[in-house]
Design a protein with these regions (language model features):
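Gly/Pro-rich hinge or "lid" segments in bacterial periplasmic/extracellular proteins
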Residues: 81, 148, 153, 159, ...
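Cleaved targeting-peptide boundary
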Residues: 26-34
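Sec-exported extracytoplasmic/periplasmic mature domains
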Residues: 74-78, 95, 103-107, 124-132, ...
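Aromatic- and charge-enriched surface segment that lines or borders ligand/interaction sites
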Residues: 88-135, 171, 261
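Gram-negative bacterial Sec-dependent N-terminal signal peptides
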Residues: 2-25
Length: 268
């Protein structure tokens, strides 16, 4: 079996997992439905997260929170299908050159616009050996131009086939046609990350007060081994359809404890 065939099979498995793990951040409330006055949610997340950096996470607990804090070009809809995220539309030429058109109202939580250059920086950072991302090889599934040589140390990260045509247009060039490429972009590691915050705070950029997000929520509080609290982001482009105002994640590994706290009303 060739390496390409093996990689295609792995990519198919990755896609299935990604589509199954969708997270709904917004909702259309039916006419006549009155929402509860207090819109909060408390969830058991299974364990303490190792990081909130999209390029450092690899477990389900981390991914659950990352999808609330950061939004990539695409997201998964309620049925697990890829849907527009920061990219409101996209097109391709022979499934090899992909162009993503970003929303002009997409913003970071500090009010600055989310741009195509943010994605260029993020994707280059994800494959940078200095980042040591567990998903550094993820973009190989999409056969992005230059990725193999970059991971082998033969080319610089600036040779990755991703380019900002302008603030709201991102062009991605692949080494071969990949019809399913857009589906890969719901993965947390392809989300944009805030360059200014990372350069200012270094490894502490994900701490409350330092972190800048572009998803439906921002980080309000993080008490290790106790709770992570997220609150609704007023700068999120689809904030008008965000229903839950606050989400609290609890790191409860014991199923017995989880059930008992659910029965007592401590977990939703």
């Amino acid at each position: 079996m060739t390496n390409i065939t093996k990689r295609s099979l792995v990519a198919a498995g990755v896609l299935a997992a990604l589509m199954a793990g969708n997270v709904a951040l917004a909702a259309d409330v039916p006419a006549g439905v009155t929402l509860a006055e207090k819109q909060t949610l408390v969830r058991n997340n299974g364990s303490e997260v190792q990081s909130l950096d999209p390029h450092k996470i690899e477990g389900v607990p981390e991914s659950n929170i990352s999808r609330d804090l950061f939004e990539g070009l695409l997201v998964s809809d309620l049925d697990g299908h890829p849907a527009p995220g920061v990219a409101e539309s996209w097109d391709n030429k022979d499934a090899k050159v992909w162009t993503f058109h970003l929303r002009k109202d997409a913003k970071w939580s500090d009010g600055t616009p989310v741009t195509a250059q943010d994605f260029v920086y993020s994707w280059q950072r994800s494959v940078d050996p200095n980042t040591a991302s567990p998903y550094a090889s993820y973009l190989q599934y999409g056969h992005i131009a230059g990725i193999d040589e970059i991971l082998e140390g033969k080319k610089p990260i600036t040779d990755l086939g991703v380019k900002a045509i302008d603030d709201h247009t991102l062009e991605v060039t692949l080494s071969e046609p990949v019809p399913y490429f857009y589906k890969l972009l719901v993965h947390p590691s392809t989300s944009p990350v805030p360059k200014a915050a990372i350069e200012k705070f270094g490894e502490k950029w994900t701490q409350p007060g330092n972190i800048v997000t572009n998803g439906a929520y921002t980080l309000k509080d993080w008490v290790v081994n106790e709770r992570i609290v997220l609150e609704r982001s007023p700068t999120y482009w689809n904030n008008a359809k965000t229903v839950i105002n606050q989400v609290t994640y609890l790191p409860i590994a014991s199923e017995v404890t989880d059930v008992n706290r659910y029965r007592s009303g401590e977990i939703d």
